[in-house]
Amino acid sequence: MIDVRAITPEQTYALRHSVLWPDKPLNYVKIDEDKDGYHYGAFSDDDLVAVISLFVSKESISTGQRQPVQARFRKFATQPDWQRKGVGTILLDHVIAQARALGASVLWCDARLDAADFYRRFGMEPVSEVFYKGPIPYAKFSLTL
């Protein structure tokens, strides 16, 4: 059984590195925004098998208060031997619910094109032209919450 738990940014780094950017130094997968994000791990027993990080932006409104309006998930990584077993679906469902609970009206990500069909299953659609991070093609995908 898969259990989703809040984790620290530091707990995400090894999996982010080994799955997403194994040819880069470990620091490549650390981002400045990590300290302000919400980080979740999918666990099988006590083994961390997938990670995702959620960042909620705030925008000033007429009252001067700052309210969440958009959420972005980043650094979504699943151990290869756990891919295509529903773990990513469980984790992304959790993040969609969390984004809604935090008041976001839009959830988006920079998606690797080889994962586009996965994101479409959640109702996400591409909203940008293809762009590259190194040799890897991406597009921005978005979901109205």
Model-derived regions: residue spans:
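Short amphipathic alpha-helix that is part of the acyltransferase structural core
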Residues: 1-48
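Conserved GNAT acetyl-CoA-binding A-motif
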Residues: 99-111
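Conserved active-site tyrosine of GNAT-family acetyltransferases
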Residues: 16, 119, 124
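Conserved catalytic-core motifs of GNAT/GCN5-like acyltransferases
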Residues: 108-110, 125-142
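Conserved acetyl-CoA pyrophosphate-binding loop and the N-cap/start of the following alpha-helix
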Residues: 82, 86-94
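Short hydrophobic/aromatic beta-strand element in the GNAT-like acyltransferase core
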Residues: 26-27, 37-41, 51, 75, ...
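Conserved beta-strand in the GNAT
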Residues: 41, 47-59, 72-77
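Conserved acetyl-CoA binding element of GNAT-fold acetyltransferases
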Residues: 64-80
